[in-house]
Amino acid sequence: MHSNVKKVTDKDVIKPVGIPFVVYFSSISNNTHRFIQKLEIENIRIPYELDQSISVNRDYVLVTPTYSGGGEYVEGAVPKQVIKFLNNKENRSFCRGVISSGNTNFGDTFGIAGPIISKKLNVPFLYQFELLGTQHDVSQIKQILFRFWEDGNNERK
């Protein structure tokens, strides 16, 4: 297991309330964007341009690609745009979990942006998928997100 993976226990998890909502970043390749559209879940995209920003004031799960060189090299794994978004305290406070994408060619650092963010924010790392994802990934993530929100809504009744 990579050193950036941290086990988050149930007592640490603040489950989301409301309806499923995804905040995501996608580079100009649009791989993550195309994947998110398949989920058919309400979403908002973190802008590619660093001089633009968004604010979020409701529970969400973050979906991000991974940028890194493989092996133990994880410098730059989390896109700068995602870091900027999470540096906003309010945006960060509503993050309830993270999902990452990556390329299995990078071995141990496949999807490592997810565990890095999970560890930093103490939120669960929910799933990782490769590049554009598969229909199985779409089904799994939809199931995970709806169950995650259902649990949160039930706990707060």
UniProtKB/Swiss-Prot annotation:
Family per record: Belongs to the NrdI family.
One of the GO BP terms on file: protein modification process
GO molecular function terms noted in the UniProt entry: FMN binding
Domain of life: Bacteria
Function, as annotated: Probably involved in ribonucleotide reductase function.
Species of provenance: Mycoplasma mycoides subsp. mycoides SC (strain CCUG 32753 / NCTC 10114 / PG1)
InterPro entries: Flavoprotein-like_sf, RNR_Ib_NrdI_bac, RNR_NrdI
Pfam family, one: Flavodoxin_NdrI
HAMAP family assigned: NrdI (MF_00128)
Name the record gives this protein: Protein NrdI
